């Protein structure tokens, strides 16, 4: 049983990012409300402490040999609450697929080193279920990689969880892919490929299974990376989706 509920966690998931990325995400006109100051400071402190390990891990990832016989990735897309988590959990039972785990989304820079210890830490403190629908949570379950991107790059839609006042900007740039610079787009693509390659190495699989609702707006960029990628688009009664969301 996890020690904390979501609302009681002393840190947020930015503990899994490097200090440099942490600063890029939190600076630039971002304001932290008074009641979240302690969580902000502790998250930044943990990020600073772990950043040297993150750099070691990233060097290891850069030196991984290419995987032979890799198959085209499969991307599960669709609006939130349309059944993407369900189909992801079902298809991930197929042994041919590798995927991004909950641990890997929080600590994408610790996928190759330090994993046993930090996985234990995460399992000890994390809540047992999602607050939105009470689905079980554990470090090894399949998870959407957008949460990993929040810790790999300052260019993620899910940063609105930390700074909801800026959701319009995040939505325009990192969900709809509008007004992106070439450097931002290149960095987003690099993170996507790095996540898939490293996850496949860790799992020993040949085909990546992705579930990421924000990818619904990223299909063009994904096809530029993976021209033969497969997509599963989840559809559900829009009234039910709206009510659930």
Positions of PLM-derived features:
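Glycine-rich phosphate-binding P-loop
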Residues: 76-93
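PAPS-dependent sulfation machinery
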Residues: 106-208
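Charged, amphipathic alpha-helical linker segments immediately N-terminal to NTP-binding catalytic cores
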Residues: 2-52
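Post-Walker A helix-loop "phosphate-sensing" segment adjacent to the P-loop in P-loop NTPases
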Residues: 93-103
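N-terminal signal-anchor transmembrane helix
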Residues: 55-76, 107-109, 114-117
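Short His-Asn-centered micro-motif
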Residues: 77-79, 209-213, 235
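Conserved phosphate-donor/acceptor-positioning beta-strand/loop module used by diverse small-molecule
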Residues: 211, 222-245
